[in-house]
């Protein structure tokens, strides 16, 4: 066993007092648990622009109260160095240990003289982004692991604009964290913080104003089609209150909530992987849908920043991909804007380099500007800020990621499943009044513009050996570029580690060309306007391969995706 790992382990055994963590340390001390001990202590959880994320447990490579305290002290040092009298907004989702972590984070901030606004109950991620902006705090923290399985939790940091922190801020906070001994951090008692006015319950008006901000992007004069019915599931997460409230306030009253998934439960007892993009997570919703026959099934993930849908079509339920929903919303919102007398060429939509190519085709046909940014919603938020700084915030049409994240409106700087659900319901009702479901609406767009399809190949590389393998794969793709992918010749390569120019299509393009930040992403452009992009996941030990193909028919495009998928698997094997 590595001597430094054992030194760290013994330090934890000497200092940890929490009963569950003490018990886990005892289990790790057994000879047969050597591999588990090593994995828990061989490194510290990496703090990046997405904060921290890991499985709950004891050790430097796990999420626990000591790691949360250490991270918060690093953040507190950063805030006190950059702000006079800094303040923070703090929230959590329904995950295990979330309340414990929230109290520790609030206590550390209070002990550093930083006033912190704490949501008194679980809340969706977008409400925290909104709270930072509404309360004008210096930063925000949300304790979440998005749609990861139940053993995970995380720690996500927002800047004073409600967006994820920059690479520079993350690097400085990370350096601060590295200097902190977690056992030297002494959080203020939560009740003491409340008494001293350093810990403040977030006022109810913040949530009320969040709902009002969302309603402002509702389609004017919206009225649900006669008999329109929705099935909704929050997947035992945070979306229940906000989603049901917003639907009621726009006049959608026939909403059936999946009862087994209505209440918050960090164990996620009904699905091991509460990710609304997968049919397995929607099984209970589909079962209820079979009984009540809705027009639409909507699911939000545990922190309610992502939304998935199932569409009743020809006696079955079809799941739309994140790309398809993004394209549908984009085209429909543009149509709604035109009906209000707004010009398409004035509008700006933003997506990522790994999302569908179809919005570029839409932009050329309809005249709006389409911008492509790096993966991560903070980059979409940056584009909103640029429009705001130019006095053109109203040009923002929408932003979306292929991973089921959408934002319409400028009330937040992160993806928002609450506003996405509202608009998806309105859009589906609009099409229903025209005797179309969303699957048929999407197919109509494919027939008009071409079948631009996508696929993803994930290759998992867990543990210390996995991290080295991931680095080796990306290095090899740079040093020994592919000449073909499947039967397709490579016609161009973009290495985003070299700060490539931001791709833009159509529109006014009044600003000078923008350069994207350096990122560990490699794009291979293939003949026939097909494409493959490789990048390591920012939150999981995986290398992802994003596949792009098009065809005159669905079958043709699907065959090309299958061929690219097989080739990508060989590259990642």
Segment roles from a protein language model:
Residues 290, 294-296, 336-535, 542-546, ...:
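Phosphate-binding and adjacent anionic-ligand microenvironments
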Residues 41-61, 145-146, 234-242, 246, ...:
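Conserved phosphate/anionic-ligand binding catalytic regions in large, soluble enzymes, centered on
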Residues 154-165, 196-198, 266-273, 309-318, ...:
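Short beta-alpha connecting loops at secondary-structure transitions
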Residues 89-152, 249-309:
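N-terminal small/polar loop signature for handling phosphorylated ligands or for N-terminal nucleophile
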Residues 4-105, 192, 199-227, 238, ...:
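An N-terminal, well-structured beta->alpha segment
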Residues 12, 16, 20, 36-45, ...:
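Gly/Ser/Thr-enriched, mixed-charge loops and adjacent short helices
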Residues 127-185, 302, 313, 402:
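Active-site phosphate-binding/coordination module
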């Amino acid at each position: 066993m590595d001597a430094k790992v054992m030194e760290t382990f013994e330090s934890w055994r000497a200092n940890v007092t929490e009963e569950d963590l003490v018990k886990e340390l005892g289990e790790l001390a057994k000879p047969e648990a050597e591999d588990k001990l090593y994995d828990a202590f061989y490194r510290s959880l990496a703090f990046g622009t997405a904060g921290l994320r890991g499985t709950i447990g004891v050790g430097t490579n796990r999420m626990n109260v000591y790691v949360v305290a250490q991270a918060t002290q690093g953040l507190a040092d950063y805030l006190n160095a950059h702000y006079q009298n800094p303040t923070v907004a703090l929230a959590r989702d329904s995950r295990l240990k979330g309340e414990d972590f929230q109290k520790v984070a609030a206590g550390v901030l209070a002990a550093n003289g930083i006033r912190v606004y704490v949501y008194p109950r679980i809340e969706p991620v977008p409400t925290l982004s909104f709270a930072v902006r509404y309360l004008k705090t210096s930063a925000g923290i949300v304790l979440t692991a998005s749609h990861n399985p139940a053993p995970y939790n995380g720690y996500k940091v927002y800047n004073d604009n409600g967006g994820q922190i920059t690479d520079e801020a993350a690097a400085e906070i990370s350096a601060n964290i590295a200097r902190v001994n977690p056992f030297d951090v002494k959080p203020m008692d939560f009740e003491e913080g409340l008494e001293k006015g350093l810990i403040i319950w977030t006022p109810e008006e913040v949530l009320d104003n969040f709902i009002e901000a969302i309603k402002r992007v509702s389609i004017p004069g919206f009225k649900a089609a006669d008999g329109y019915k929705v099935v909704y599931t929050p997947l035992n997460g945070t979306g229940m209150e906000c989603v049901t409230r917003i639907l009621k306030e726009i006049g959608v009253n026939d909403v059936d909530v999946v009862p087994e998934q209505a209440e918050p439960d960090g164990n996620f007892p009904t699905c091991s992987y509460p990710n609304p993009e997968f049919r397995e997570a929607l099984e209970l919703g589909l079962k209820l849908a079979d009984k009540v026959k809705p027009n639409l099934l909507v699911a939000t993930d545990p922190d309610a920043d992502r939304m998935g849908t199932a569409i009743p079509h020809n006696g079955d339920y079809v799941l739309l991909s994140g790309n398809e929903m993004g394209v549908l919303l984009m085209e429909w919102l543009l149509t709604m804007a035109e009906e209000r007398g707004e010009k398409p060429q004035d509008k700006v939509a933003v997506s990522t380099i790994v999302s569908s190519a179809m919005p570029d085709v839409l932009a050329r046909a309809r005249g709006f500007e389409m911008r492509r940014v790096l993966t991560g919603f903070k980059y979409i938020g940056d584009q909103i800020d640029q429009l705001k700084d130019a006095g053109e915030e109203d040009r923002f049409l929408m932003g979306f990621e292929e991973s089921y994240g959408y934002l319409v409106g400028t009330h937040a700087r992160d993806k928002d499943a609450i506003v996405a659900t509202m608009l998806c319901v309105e859009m589906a009702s609009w099409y229903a009044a025209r005797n179309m479901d969303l699957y048929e609406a999407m197919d109509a767009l494919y027939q008009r513009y071409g079948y631009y399809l996508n696929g993803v190949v994930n290759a998992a590389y867990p543990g210390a050996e996995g991290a080295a393998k991931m680095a080796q794969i990306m290095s090899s793709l740079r040093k020994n570029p592919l000449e073909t992918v499947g039967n397709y010749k490579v016609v161009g390569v973009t290495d985003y580690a070299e700060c490539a120019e931001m791709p833009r299509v159509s529109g006014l393009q009044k600003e000078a060309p923008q350069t994207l930040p350096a990122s560990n992403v490699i794009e291979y452009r293939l003949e026939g306007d097909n494409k493959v992009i490789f990048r390591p996941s920012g939150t999981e030990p995986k290398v992802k391969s994003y596949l792009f193909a098009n065809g005159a028919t669905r079958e043709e495009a699907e065959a090309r995706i299958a061929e690219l998928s097989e080739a990508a698997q060989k590259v990642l094997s």
